[in-house]
């Protein structure tokens, strides 16, 4: 049975894991790392780079290197949070036709799910390389405080990447699964404090034994979907830029290249200051003016960094208080505190959490990998590999509809366990009204316009009647992914209308299908690119080997043999410069055949040399000369085998 993988699609880094027997395994990517930067770059020669390779070239290609795209997913362009981000990133964020925030790269407009899909494709490929089989299904994690639009957009990203998303689960819940799966059985209440690259979540989770099952029940969740390590970096970037401006009068915000270098340096300094008390931010030739090049060199202490980000850390405490209140618990009733997300490595964050909860957070959970591990466990539950775990998650925000006077009437309160269903009967506001618009909202405000609009639809052909007489039954149904279906029915006629809530923006089915097709064509291009690269490498190796062998056997080859091999080398060199795969393969075979006799001769020569060396020990006789000969001969043979 094909594996379902678990993916932590992070703002800064992503991670993939799978269950092997009863143990989750975090899979290393092709570069040998257990996490992959969530960065996608578009190069001038139409190559798409993902992860470390994209990060490495970001300084020289800032406008076409996209990072922290998760902060834009499912968001409107006019959102104040997006407007703030526009000023901070070197790439271009623009308004799509549907009002969403998209990005513009190389004169093409791309939706955030399209960019996230590239990261997911890399995660999918990482898992496939490890498992040795195709992967089609995944569990993907999202911040607990993601709204419906953001969850839908994440599911779309999965589809574009060629994955069927079996379940969307909340990051803190996944971390709790990773923590609680192998812990001693028994009841406990844990707080998962998740401060990642772009989002913050706090979840209060009860782990209990119920009828032999290990039950994970989320009691309450809260958070901020625009607070994370990226904001800590930005605070430091602002400080460094303002210090530089004080010294030189030059504003680095106007220079994308300098801004990208500053971002890298800020991230590095922040990480260093988690273990050191001070560090130097040293960026030579960061910019230049009429008087010549300018260098940035600033000493930074841990205390200074903490003063810059103190307010950001404090912002995490209010959601913690709200989550505890919603769960009906006090701080003293929390048994364990778990830290998730790379930003929780900062000593100030750990100290603040310890002071609030009155206990030291656990250190036995890997903050970078716990979420992916939890996703893999949930994937194993869905595939039936793991039997005795039950996960009860909640909806993070209240859901309702707009009623008379612009008021939001809630049908499902926040922190309701999902899946869930709620029905309420409404009526018309005017006499002889024949249609009603159902405006679906998500949020906690009484005023409808202050909440997030998820979508609207009309129920028509209601028989004319005095206001208040028709009975319109509205049903909200949330699935296990936290995604909403809404239906409305006129009880008198039985006429009904229903929709799976697609945000008033969001991607249409046609757009997603087009993006899936586009991603598939890229995958085909990538495959061809890789095959050509491997073929060229094979050709270069054979050319080098043959040229070396010809020098060694210069006196033993006939003129015809030399000429034949030289011609074959020359033709292969010429073929490698082109893009005709069949021609390269053909010329590779010609040279392989031509050099086969030469390889036999080298082998025979080396063997006879080895036997002739009488003054050496037996081991010396058989080691060095023979070994060299074997390597060369084997190398040639392998090439021939490859051709066959």
From Swiss-Prot:
Sequence positions bearing Phosphothreonine: 199
UniProt keyword annotation of Zinc present: no
Family: Belongs to the heat shock protein 70 family.
Residue ranges of the region described as Disordered: 603-644
Record-linked Pfam families: HSP70
InterPro entries per record: ATPase_NBD (IPR043129), Chaperone_DnaK (IPR012725), Heat_shock_70_CS (IPR018181), HSP70_C_sf (IPR029048), HSP70_peptide-bd_sf (IPR029047), Hsp_70_fam (IPR013126)
Protein's UniProt keywords contain Transit peptide: no
Record lineage: Bacteria, Pseudomonadati, Pseudomonadota, Gammaproteobacteria, Legionellales
Induction text: By stress conditions e.g. heat shock.
Residues that span the membrane, as ranges: none
Compositionally biased region (Polar residues): 609-623
Annotated protein name in UniProt: Chaperone protein DnaK
Single Gene Ontology MF annotation: unfolded protein binding
Keywords for the protein's UniProt record, in alphabetical order: ATP-binding, Chaperone, Nucleotide-binding, Phosphoprotein, Stress response
Biased composition annotated in UniProt, kind: Acidic residues: 629-644
Entry function: Acts as a chaperone.
